[in-house]
């Protein structure tokens, strides 16, 4: 027992140490740097009992994200807080999300250390649940700020779009990963107002292959996804076009209360712009080039890839190295009162009692498929 406790304490020290003098590494050094080597690896000796659950940050169909701190921290680590994503095995199985959950953990493990992607520090499991320990982004969702502001000015939209471009460049060109769920709800702000992309449940390694799964959020789906033609990383550039439109107007270009009607609009209607608010010609052009029905002509997916995106007039004057190294000041600085402040997140009801148990029969059938945790 003492040996297990010592091992758990060592794992705690390792992942806490990562944040003490975190530095931004060039993209080609992220995976090679010894400092990032252990990030995302499974921790066999960690338990949910090693953490104090402070409050819920978000919920999903089969997951709940908690704000947590170490249960027995060293004095210098008392202010350290994290986000703990808890996935109930029985719900993951019922909703046929086993592959998606494994993809999420695997992809996050490989991209840990990127300045604009949530950091998977470690993962672990117990009989009933899977756990992913992530860095805490205290600013909350970009979605919330957009709703309060009604819309963003062009400089704000450009700031967030530029950071997303660097995310997609890294995922697509270095990792061969399609993210497939770009939307304001999946963009969090850190304490300095920079983006962190979260929720990689639909992310998938494609390389140069196509995939045919219908997944994502209706308003942001590319036409080839809806038409089951097979899709690639090009779907993320389409979604970025939709996102920039929403940043500038306050709403997506395709909308209806019935998702089927949204799909019909996406595959048949070009993006149109309102008379008000005024949108610059450069912004309109980049949106149109991202939201091109034929992906072979879609900006980001054509020859030159992300480099062509960076050269677009919408990003004129942007120094991309300064974007990557976070030298630009965030346009929205989240209000924070103390370390671990969660005022920028909604309140959520407690978990319901009487959840369906993860039986020994289910464990015998499925536990091998969760061995990555």
Describe every region a protein language model picked out.
Residues 127-141, 145:
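Conserved short submotifs of the Hanks-type protein kinase catalytic core
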Residues 123:
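Activation-segment/catalytic-loop signature of the eukaryotic protein kinase fold
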Residues 64-89:
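Glycine-rich ATP phosphate-binding loop
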Residues 283, 324-373:
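Eukaryotic Ser/Thr kinase distal regulatory-tail detector
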Residues 1-48:
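Intrinsically disordered, low-complexity regulatory segments that flank or precede the catalytic domain
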Residues 54-61, 65:
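Protein kinase glycine-rich loop
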Residues 160-161:
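Activation segment signature within eukaryotic-like protein kinase domains
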């Amino acid at each position: 027992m003492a040996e297990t406790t010592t091992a758990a304490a060592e794992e705690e020290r390792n992942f806490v140490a990562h944040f003490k003098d975190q530095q931004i590494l060039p993209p080609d050094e992220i995976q090679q740097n010894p400092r990032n080597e252990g990030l995302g690896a499974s921790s066999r000796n960690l338990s949910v009992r090693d953490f104090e659950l402070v409050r819920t940050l978000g919920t999903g169909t089969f997951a709940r994200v908690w704000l947590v701190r170490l249960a027995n921290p060293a004095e210098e680590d008392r202010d350290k807080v994290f986000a703990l994503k808890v996935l109930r095995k029985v719900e993951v199985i019922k909703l046929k999300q086993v592959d998606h959950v494994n993809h999420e953990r695997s992809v996050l493990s490989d991209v840990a250390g990127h300045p604009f992607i949530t950091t998977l520090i470690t993962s672990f499991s117990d009989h009933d649940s899977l756990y992913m320990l992530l860095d805490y982004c205290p600013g909350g969702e970009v979605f919330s700020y957009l709703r309060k502001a009604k819309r963003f000015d062009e400089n704000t939209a450009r700031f967030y779009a530029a950071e997303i471009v660097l995310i997609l460049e890294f995922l697509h060109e270095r990792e061969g990963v399609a993210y497939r769920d770009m939307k304001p709800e999946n963009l969090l702000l850190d304490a300095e107002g920079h983006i962190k992309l979260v929720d990689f449940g639909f992310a998938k390694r494609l390389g140069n292959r196509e995939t045919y799964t219908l997944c994502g959020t209706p308003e942001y789906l590319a036409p080839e996804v809806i038409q089951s033609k097979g899709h690639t990383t090009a779907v993320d550039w389409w979604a970025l076009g939709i996102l920039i439109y929403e940043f500038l107007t306050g709403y997506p270009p395709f909308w209806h209360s019935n998702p089927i009607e949204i799909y019909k609009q996406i595959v048949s209607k070009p993006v149109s712009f309102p008379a008000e608010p005024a949108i610059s010609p450069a912004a309109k052009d980049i949106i149109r080039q991202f939201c091109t029905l034929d992906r072979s002509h879609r900006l980001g997916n054509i020859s030159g890839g992300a480099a062509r995106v960076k050269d677009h007039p919408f990003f004129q004057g942007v120094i991309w190295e300064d974007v990557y190294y976070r030298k630009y000041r965030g346009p929205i600085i989240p209000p924070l009162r103390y370390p671990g402040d969660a005022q920028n997140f909604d309140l959520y009801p407690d978990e319901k009692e009487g959840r369906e148990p993860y039986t020994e029969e289910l464990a015998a059938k499925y536990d091998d498929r969760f061995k990555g945790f």
